C-alpha cells in the first residue's frame, strides 16, 4: 500500500497469513489520507525482523489497532515505525514489546506531533540498539515520558536530536 496517498480505508486484511513474512517495512507508508486500519492485531509476527517505516506518514490516522501483543522478539529494525503520524492521539500499549534484538530505533516516534504521552517504554531492553537519533524528534505535544534513564546505551553510535523540538517536555 506504499504511497497510496488518497486511500481512505483498506479492505479487511485481518486474516492475512503473515506466518512467513520477515519484512513489513513501508507497508502502509505514505498513506497520508488513511483514516483507519483494519484489525491487524492477530497477525503472526513471529518471523518479522523489519518493521521500518511501517506506518510512516500515515498523517490522518488518529489511532492504531491494538498491536500490543505482536511478537517482536526477532525485530532488529523499527526505525521510523510511527514517523510522521501527525494525528495519532495515542498508541497501543507497546510497553511489553520485546526489544532485545532491536538495533535501529532511529526516528521511531519522530514527528508524532499530536501525541501527549507514550506507553511506558522504560522496560524496553536497549542493549543492542546502535541507532537512536531522532527517536522523539518533533513530538511537539509530548508532555510526559516514562523514565528511560535505565536504558542501556553502551552500544549506541548515534543519539543526536533525541528530544529535538519536544517543546512541551
Question: What function would you assign to each model-found segment?
Answer:
Residues 1-169:
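Negatively charged
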Amino acid at each position: 500500500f506504499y504511497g497510496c496517498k488518497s486511500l481512505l480505508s483498506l479492505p479487511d486484511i485481518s486474516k492475512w497469513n503473515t506466518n512467513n513474512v520477515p519484512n513489513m517495512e513501508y507497508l502502509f507508508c505514505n498513506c497520508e489520507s488513511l483514516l483507519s486500519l483494519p484489525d491487524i492485531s492477530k497477525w503472526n509476527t513471529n518471523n518479522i525482523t523489519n518493521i521500518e517505516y511501517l506506518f510512516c506518514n500515515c498523517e490522518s490516522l488518529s489511532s492504531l489497532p491494538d498491536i500490543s501483543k505482536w511478537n517482536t522478539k526477532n525485530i532488529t529494525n523499527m526505525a521510523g515505525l510511527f514517523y510522521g503520524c501527525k494525528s495519532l492521539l495515542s498508541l497501543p500499549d507497546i510497553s511489553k514489546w520485546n526489544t532485545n534484538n532491536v538495533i535501529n530505533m532511529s526516528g521511531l516516534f519522530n514527528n508524532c506531533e499530536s501525541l501527549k504521552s507514550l506507553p511506558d517504554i522504560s522496560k524496553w531492553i536497549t542493549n543492542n540498539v546502535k541507532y537512536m537519533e531522532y527517536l522523539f524528534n518533533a513530538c511537539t505535544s509530548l508532555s510526559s515520558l516514562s523514565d528511560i534513564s535505565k536504558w542501556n546505551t553502551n552500544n549506541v553510535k548515534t543519539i543526536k536530536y533525541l528530544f529535538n523540538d519536544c517543546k512541551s517536555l
